Amino acid sequence: MNLNDDDDNYNSAIVIDNGSYLCKAGFGGEESPRAIFRSVVGRPNFCTRGVKNGMGQKDCYVGDEAIVKKSILSLKCPNESKSPVNWDDIEKILHHVFYNELRVTIDKGVLLSEIPLNPKENRERITQIMFETFDTPNFYLANQSVLSLYSKGRLNGIVLDSGNNITYTVPIYEGHSIPNSINQLEIAGNSVTEYLMKILNENRGYNFTTSSEKEIVKDIKEKFGFISLNYNNDLYSTKVATNEIEKSYQLPDGQMITIGKERFICGEVLFEPSLVNIESYGVHQLLYNSIINCDFEIRRGLYNNIILSGGTTMLPDFNDRIKNELINLSPSSMKIKVVENNTNENNSHLAWIGGSIFSSLSTFEQQSISKQEYMEYGSKIIQRKCF
């Protein structure tokens, strides 16, 4: 039963893509998520714990409400890659999705996305939470990159998925990822933002240091950042020398700041991790390595079906840079195709859209785990039914 009487989506599965920065949630069969909010939980910090609940203080805040009150809260992102999963906070985010954002009772099943190479113990724990804490009648856990591929109507291809914390390259054949050929790099959108902070401070004499200022720099990146198609040439180009690429940005206090070559220098960390002292291949090389680690017979289909997913891949010219780099790395006989998005399609929503499509299929209930199966086999059933 849906608590919104005027809503006709109560027959649809609930679809949740809980990323490291944003959580997207909605109903299967719809074109876009109903709710998008920050994947963050805030609790009163030491200085404010003594404030009584009668004065309006809650034990915790989730999502955008936590961001608004961040000055008096200690914020945690439960999906951050470098930290152990905080299951209590995961439960709070899911509770917020069901009862505050979507306002539903859970009687039609849930599809939840997961990261590639998600550890078995994490998969079993979230399965336990869904059945024992939220009492869902059906549950399905799906690789976020596979869902992104589904959003393009494909079962075969390779997904370069770059969100806030990690970039993955995931080859997929007949709707299943190929685990031994998946690569990952702990450089993504957050790394680009932090590098932009660093070079603006060093090159322009600014002093961006706080978390609030980091959000400002993130906004600068999203408004003015782009990927260079020829980094060394652009770095010493006439446009840079004559300040033609400079843009002005107004800070919240009204001060105007200027950004020039930093607009494309920041994104180069994705292709040259050594800029931030990380010894690793760039995202283009990881993509190529994932392809050549697959059987020869399926490589052509991977080269010809490259999907870019995650907000970081929305930086202008990212698509063309990836294509150019792969052309340089690959045999000349191979056709390289990066699948274009439809007008107004948001790369950061692809996993959710794929989940919406998959959960609306007539076979979804049969493919998902039922409450009866969970009661009979326990949480390990996830390893057999969702792979």
Curated annotation (Swiss-Prot):
Membrane-crossing segments per the record: none
Record-listed E.C. numbers: 3.6.4.-
Molecular function as annotated in GO: ATP binding; hydrolase activity; myosin binding; structural constituent of cytoskeleton
Gene Ontology annotations for the cellular component aspect, listed alphabetically: actin cytoskeleton; cytoplasm
Predominant subcellular localization, coarse grouping: cytoplasm
Top class in the EC scheme: hydrolase
InterPro entries hit by this protein: Actin, ATPase_NBD
Catalytic reaction equation(s): ATP + H2O = ADP + phosphate + H(+)
Keywords: ATP-binding, Cytoplasm, Cytoskeleton, Hydrolase, Nucleotide-binding
One Pfam family from the record: Actin
Function according to Swiss-Prot or TrEMBL: Actins are highly conserved proteins that are involved in various types of cell motility and are ubiquitously expressed in all eukaryotic cells. Multiple isoforms are involved in various cellular functions such as cytoskeleton structure, cell mobility, chromosome movement and muscle contraction.
Protein family per UniProt: Belongs to the actin family.
Protein name: Putative actin-29
Species of the source: Dictyostelium discoideum (Social amoeba)
Lineage of source species: Eukaryota, Amoebozoa, Evosea, Eumycetozoa, Dictyostelia
Gene: act29
